[in-house]
Amino acid sequence: MNVTLTKAELADLLFERVGLNKREAKDMVEGFFEEIRTALERGDSVKLSGFGNFQLRDKPQRPGRNPKTGEEIPITARRVVTFHASQKLKAAVEQLSDASKQP
């Protein structure tokens, strides 16, 4: 059962569970992700205790290949965002995975 949780659904959960009105819930979710984006744009890491870390990583230029022609082409250097799940999150996901495998 793969379901995707969206920002709109997060806002609905805040509305239902916390008691914010729908506008406040939507603004809170948007603001949360905006703060993460802004921090990453500044080059800062984002550490969410019990969840994980978002970090920037510079990837150097490397050789690549056009799969159609086989021609070698350079893949330019770039900066990417990486996410590393916390041990707590990994353990929770693993526990769910183990439970779903039980008959």
From Swiss-Prot:
The record's GO molecular-function terms, alphabetically, read: DNA binding; structural constituent of chromatin
What are the alphabetically sorted keywords of the record?
DNA recombination, DNA-binding, Transcription, Transcription regulation, Translation regulation
Tell me which GO cellular component terms the UniProt record holds. Answer: cytosol
Query: Which segments carry the region annotation Disordered?
Result: 51-73
Gene3D superfamilies, alphabetically?
IHF-like DNA-binding proteins
Entry similarity comment: Belongs to the bacterial histone-like protein family.
Assembly and partners are described as: Heterodimer of an alpha and a beta chain.
Entry function? This protein is one of the two subunits of integration host factor, a specific DNA-binding protein that functions in genetic recombination as well as in transcriptional and translational control.
Provide the protein name.
Integration host factor subunit alpha
